[in-house]
Curated annotation (Swiss-Prot):
One of the early assembly proteins it binds 23S rRNA. One of the proteins that surrounds the polypeptide exit tunnel on the outside of the ribosome. Forms the main docking site for trigger factor binding to the ribosome. One of its GO terms (molecular function) is structural constituent of ribosome. It comes from Psychrobacter sp. (strain PRwf-1). GO terms for cellular component: ribonucleoprotein complex; ribosome. The lineage of its organism: Bacteria, Pseudomonadati, Pseudomonadota, Gammaproteobacteria, Moraxellales. Keywords: Ribonucleoprotein, Ribosomal protein, RNA-binding, rRNA-binding. InterPro entries: Nucleotide-bd_a/b_plait_sf, Ribosomal_uL23-like, Ribosomal_uL23/eL15/eS24_sf. This is Large ribosomal subunit protein uL23.
Length: 116
């Protein structure tokens, strides 16, 4: 399994009341993942993307898309797979910090460009 495949496994975090509660109390992170991803691929992808994090357990479930109406038109949302990733005790995935670092670096480079 190559790293290019692992970078395509995780699609993004799931932010909900349940995922926040699980993250705070049990150290479980919730991600949207590729529909064809296996539990082993999900574990390796999380450990690759978030360095220093050890995954102890992965639970997955397939979420069926809801049927939605817009007037007379009937549509359907896409199906997706969700993964509950349990981390080793005392560890946490810091997703918000990475975004702040990128924003800080962009701000500092724009300030130096203005000074020159």
């Amino acid at each position: 399994m190559n790293n290019a495949r692992l970078y395509q496994v995780l699609k993004g975090p799931v932010f909900s009341e349940k995922s926040q509660l699980l993250g705070d109390s049990l150290g479980v992170q919730v991600f949207k993942v590729d529909n064809n991803a296996t539990k082993r691929e999900i574990k390796k992808a999380v450990e690759l993307m978030f360095e220093g994090v050890e995954v102890t357990k992965v639970n997955t479930l397939n979420v069926k898309g809801k049927t939605k109406r817009f007037g007379r038109t009937v549509g359907r949302r896409n199906d997706y797979k969700k993964a509950y990733v349990t981390l080793k005790a005392g560890q946490d995935v810091q997703m918000a910090d990475a975004g702040e670092e990128i924003a800080d670096n962009a701000a500092s480079t724009s300030e130096t460009a203005n000074n020159e």
